[in-house]
Amino acid sequence: MTSNSFPVFDGVSNKYDNNTFYGRYQNFRDITDPSTLFATEKDLSQSKTLLDNFKKGLVDPVKHSDELWKAKKILDSTIHPDTGKPIFLPFRVSAFLPINVIICAGLILPNASIGTTIFWQWINQSYNIALNHANRNASNTMSNKQILEAYASAVGISCSLAVGLGWGVNKLNIQNKTISSALRMMVPFTAVTSAGIANVLIMRGNEMVNGIDIKDKDGVIHGKSKEAGKSAVYKVAFSRAATSFPALLLPPIVMGLFERTSFVKKYPKVRMPLNLAVIAAIFNTSLPAAIALFPQESTISADSLEPQFRNIKDKNGNIIKEFIYNKGL
């Protein structure tokens, strides 16, 4: 073990146990760590060189384990696992937290006008569609027409629900402030979650129709599976809903408690920075937790796949009982 009680780097094993939720949570805390956004081209190049030298047996893994883990963290948060190319900085998962703090603050603005509501829903879905596209499974190829259709659908759903539900809550004219506030809090959550799920289903729908690459434990790709594609898309859609739940519902509740304090009443200008801090704190925990619900490299039983994958043998002549696929983010 290293000085930080991490396993000695071996280039194969994970820093944390990806078989457990907590292990995956710790792993995605690394991947979503905004500090990796400050990694320079030089840092990226040095990280690649260090790991390449390790593979060649030129680096002592015991002596340089911490440096190797740091290099892997930089690459994992920057490089797409399928293409091996850097993901455009704003659309890396590590950028999701700082960017969405601002977006969430806009989505839950109290007494927002219809124009403001539409604007923030549009901004949110525009960012989500770009994030989905940048982090999709590499075997997912979409035409510009399909991307535009997905984008228009997601924006249309989110804006329609946000405006329609907001109008509906106002028309109900509920006198009980607690119930009225609760319903108002549900409006952005329902709109964002519904559109987010639709966004994933539309953007990655061809993965369910055409399938995604599946491989064995040795990394050998054995073809495309529609069942694996469905599994990947459903898992990501569920994770997106899980991300929205705490990020959009908890901040108004927490801020409601702060609003009652004498400090906030005395200094009302602290409300916005305090609101942003609350959203950031919640996102910092909820984002990696939601992504960690399912492993990035998920496994699926051969029996759950199409018939042609049920009697395939690996390089040692053994029938493959379990395949691996990249579920994407």
From Swiss-Prot:
The gene is sfxn. Mitochondrial amino-acid transporter that mediates transport of serine into mitochondria. It is a multi-pass membrane protein. InterPro entries: Mtc. Keywords: Amino-acid transport, Membrane, Mitochondrion, Transmembrane, Transmembrane helix, Transport. It holds the Pfam family SFXNs. It comes from the Eukaryota. This is Sideroflexin. Belongs to the sideroflexin family. It is found in: Mitochondrion membrane. GO terms for biological process: amino acid transport; mitochondrial transmembrane transport. One of its GO terms (cellular component) is mitochondrial inner membrane. GO terms for molecular function: monoatomic ion transmembrane transporter activity; transmembrane transporter activity. The lineage of its organism: Eukaryota, Amoebozoa, Evosea, Eumycetozoa, Dictyostelia. The chain crosses the membrane at residues 95-115, 147-167, 183-203, 238-258, 274-294.
